[in-house]
Amino acid sequence: MDFWFSEMQTPNVKLSIRVDHQLYSGKSEFQRIDVFESPEFGRFLTLDGYMMLTEKDEFIYHEMITHVPMAVHPKVRDVLVIGAGDGGVIRELTRYPEIEHIDMAEIDPLVVEVCRKYLPQTACRLDDPRLSIYYEDGVRFVRSKENCYDLIIVDSTDPFGPGEGLFTREFYGSCFKALREDGIMVNQHESPFYAADAAACQRAHKRI
């Protein structure tokens, strides 16, 4: 019998990937975490039934969210990454020898644990000596920071569930305060391709 992972995009659109077998399924304090093996995309991670990344194409997202701000800023030394429990953003940041320190605030330690075990392609640099991992809410973490970072990358889930607090005026104000004068902030944002996603983006923007 065929085994497929399917994610509803809208009531009228469903995307499916054939699965060889399931590598992991568990539930943390915050969300359900699953890892699957597929013939077409390799291993892939889902949170609460939503696709987060696949081994085949994760580099596209992680390279773009990291290397564009690194190319723009004249000298990045200190970086804050919020979310990013899969380790892909950290992997890309550690390619830069000029970066002196990276703080990573990830709310769910089980995501990191699972990715270390099942997704070493993305989690391969989570032991870099320049990295400090804090298992706490990114909203709370950044609130106490001031003039600390040259770059903030928010690699979160979409504007619902554990990531909802990262799309508010308060959070963006805290990030502005945490950045140095020439600092840059980059935020993952859901694509407004479908009408329901566009409405969610508009609601998030109104809070900002």
Question: Which sequence ranges carry the predicted segments?
Answer:
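Short strand-turn-strand beta-turns centered on an Asx-Gly dipeptide
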Residues: D48-G49
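The AdoMet/dcAdoMet-binding core of the Class I SAM-like
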Residues: D2, L53-N187, Y194-H205
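N-terminal auxiliary segments of SAM/dcSAM-dependent transferases
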Residues: M1-F44
